[in-house]
C-alpha cells in the first residue's frame, strides 16, 4: 500500500514537471513559430520531467520522504527512462528531422535516419575507450556503460559552462570593468553611422541613374553575352556612364561598415545604461556580488589547480569540512553532524534551483540565437539532449556535496562508476574554460575602447 502511495506522489510530481516543460516550450522556445511538431514537444517535456525528478529524489533522500525501497525503485526506473531518451530516442529524431529538411533524401528519410543514429552510437560508444570510467566487471550491455558515457559528455558541458560563468559573472556585475562612455562618444559614433548611410543612399542613387541612362541608350538589351561580355562589363564602361560593378562593391563595403557601426552604437548605449544602473542601490548590490564572485572564481581556480597537481578528490562534503574547520578554530561546542545535514540540504536545494534556472535561461538565449523555422525542431531536440546530459551529470557531481550517509543510494543506483574521475575531469575542463574565458574577456575589454576611439 505504501508503495502505491509513494508511486502516486512521484507520478503526480512528474505530471507537474511535464506540464511546466510543456509551458516553457510553448511560451518561450516556440512562441514565435507556428509550425510545431508535437513529438518534439513531448520529447522535450518528458526529458525535462525526468531530469527534474532526479533532483526531486535527491531532496527526498535527504528529507527521508517516501519509503527507501520506493525511492530506490523510482531512482532505477527514472535513470533507465532518461538514458533511453538520451541515447536512443532523441538522437534518432534529431537525425530524422535533419534528413526531413533535405529534399533529396525525403522519400528514404527513415533509412537515412537509422544510418545517422548508428553513426552516433558508434562514436558514442568509442567515447568511453580513452577514459577510465568503468569497473572491469561491468558487461557491455549494463546500464553503467550508458551512464558513464553520458556522464563524460555532461560533465564536460557543465565544466565549460561553469568555467565561463565563474569569470563572466564578476565581469558582468562589477562596475570596475565598465568603460567610461559619454554622450559625446555616442553622438560621434551616431554621426559616423549617419554619414555612412548618406553615402550608401548617394551611391545607390548613382546606380539607379546609371541604370536608367543605360536602359535609355539600349545598353541593357544589347549587352554582349558570354565570358568576354562579362569581363567587358566588369572592366569597362561606356563613355559618360558609371561602372556599376565597382559602385556595387563600394555599397556592399559601406553596408557592412554601417552594420558594424550600428552594433557598436547599440553596445555604447547598453554600456551607458549599465553605468547608470550601477549607481542605483540594486546596481551597487550586484557590484558587491561581483567582488564576491571574483573571490570565488580565484578560489575555485586555485582549488582546481591544487586538485589536478596533487591528484586528489575531497572525501568530505564541503559543508561538513567547512563547519569542522570553523569549530576547531573557534574551539566551541557544536553538533557538526546535525547542522551539516540541514545546511547541506539548503545548499543542495540552492544548487538544484540555480542549475535548473540557469540552464533554462541559457537554453532560451541559445535557441533564439541560432534557430529558424526549418531548424527549430532539431535545435530543440539538441537542447533536450544537452539538458538531460547536464542533469544526469549534476547528479554525479552533486553526490560529493552530500553527507556520506545520503550518497549510498546514488552509488547503488549509478553502479560502481569511477566517481573520482568525473571530479578530476571537471576540474581540468573548468580550469581550461576559466583561463580561456579570462584571456578572451581581457582581449575584448582591451580592444573595445580602441575600437570606439577609431576615426
Swiss-Prot record:
It is a multi-pass membrane protein. One of its GO terms (molecular function) is voltage-gated monoatomic anion channel activity. Keywords: Glycoprotein, Golgi apparatus, Ion channel, Ion transport, Membrane, Protein transport, Transmembrane, Transmembrane helix, Transport, Voltage-gated channel. Signal peptide: none annotated. The chain crosses the membrane at residues 5-25, 46-66, 79-99, 114-134, 150-170, 290-310, 343-363, 378-398, 425-445. One of its GO terms (cellular component) is monoatomic ion channel complex. Belongs to the Golgi pH regulator (TC 1.A.38) family. This is Golgi pH regulator. It comes from Cricetulus griseus.
